[in-house]
């Protein structure tokens, strides 16, 4: 709760090893309202800065929040799923540790991919090494495989990412191109 008010208080929660118990509650707690409180708390920690978000990403919190958000119909309350989605959005929008976001490119539905691709579009232009790593890891190819509706925010983000790579590279990694 205190993480919501100030970035230094959120960092104090991180330094005092508060992420692990919150993540554990998110995964193992049988009561949805406690899971929802844990999701909300994790989102409050991650919303302050890229450093805060990196700690959460390194602890695999985004993947856990995504798993909760994507629970099957009838599992998990609407409140839990809503809080998980909001926490995931808060963390993604601050996360500049792109390698931690790459697994979400495979697992996330399009509404979450919109936030993930927006982060890549924001961070990749300033980081040449990240662009190379993005290609080598398969993340760039995965971006090309996303089925995004024309005119959607997701499509805009993908186009923004592609604009920072040579056209031949984009074509090479696009589906249907023989290698």
What spans do the regions from the language model cover?
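Short, hydrophobic/charged alpha-helical patches characteristic of ARM/HEAT alpha-solenoid repeats
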Residues: 8-16, 33-34, 51-60, 75-82, ...
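Eukaryotic acidic, Ser/Thr-rich intrinsically disordered low-complexity regions
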Residues: 139-179
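Alpha-solenoid helical repeat architecture
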Residues: 26-30, 69-73, 105-109, 147
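Bulky hydrophobic/aromatic packing residues
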Residues: 5, 48, 54, 147-148
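Alpha-helical solenoid repeat architecture
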Residues: 1-6, 24, 36-48, 67-71, ...
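Disulfide-stabilized cysteine-rich extracellular repeat microdomains
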Residues: 18-19, 27, 31, 61-62, ...
